[in-house]
Amino acid sequence: KEKDLIKIELKKKTDKPYLELQKMVGLSEVKKVTDEILAAAKMQKMRKQMGLSGVQSSMHMLFSGNPGTAKTTVARLLSQVLKEEEVLKYGHIVECGRQDLVGKYVGWAAQIVESKFQAARGGILFIDEAYSLVEDNRTYGAEAINTIVQEMENYRDEVIVIFAGYPEKMKEFLEQNEGLASRIAFHLNFPDYSPVELTQILDLMLEKSEYRMDERTREKCFSICADACREENYGNGRFVRNLLDHAIMRQADRLIREHQNGTLEKEEACLLTADDFEMIGLKKKPQSRQIGFCAG
């Protein structure tokens, strides 16, 4: 019978969101899970063509990582990727935090949470710093969590919920509600970036912004990133974004001063030099200064 035999066609994916996700630095675990979800969706389609029953698996996720590790960026791209593959109907993302889910009075949270799930139908509900819902130990947060757990089951075929936040706090968050933990299918870790990865992220940002740097400048940027990694809460990808933004401003100031009433070549406008980059946003250790007189 024709429906007993289905040809599997493995086409090279060319969808922009998927390629953009694959191009991101690091995140091997995230990319692997994305491919598994897409493969499962394709398999369910083929089973349906064969007349077999379909299985709608839960795809709720937990993103655990420090600030600047691309959790929100990945969630936004993932919503588009899953829309392209018809896993999600609309592929939009509803982003919210504690202030968006907790009401002023008992009973309000349930209505607010329900409205968020309604808004996210056919897409992703992204809850950032979800642990803040239970940190204050007040009734409102607990009410919101209990409603979220209930709606995760009610909307499991229409909404993918992604919880995101700091690793340790997310672990404590799950321990406070067993029903919540059991409904999360994927626990994805977003590790801090290494100096090499931060420099690669800078390369991608430069390419996207139509700037470039020479090898000497790249070596300096690697050194800056290595110093940043030794600091606590340095910001990961956000640090690189700020580093580049400051470099672009310094380059602009330099070129305007150098070319007053003159002409500027396109190559110069695209080139960032080593002098344009400097450590920003982190406290430097104070250098000891010698005070006194030298013997003659």
At which residue positions do the language-model features occur?
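Conserved C-terminal "switch" segment of AAA+ ATPases
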Residues: E85-Y90, E172-E175, A181, F190-Y234, ...
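Walker A/P-loop
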Residues: S53-G91, S115-Q118, I184
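Short glycine-rich substrate-engagement loop in P-loop NTPases that contacts/grips substrate
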Residues: Y90-A120, A142
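Pre-Walker A (pre-P-loop) alpha-helix and adjacent loop at the N terminus of AAA/AAA+ ATPase modules
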Residues: K16-M59, Q80, G296
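Short helix/loop segment immediately N-terminal to the Walker
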Residues: M43-S58, D214-T217, L255-L264
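C-terminal engagement/docking regions of AAA+ P-loop ATPases
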Residues: D4, K11-D15, A252-G296
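Conserved P-loop NTPase "ATPase switch" module shared by AAA+ and STAND
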Residues: G97, A120-T139
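Conserved catalytic/switch belt of AAA+ P-loop NTPases
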Residues: Y131-I162, Y166-A181
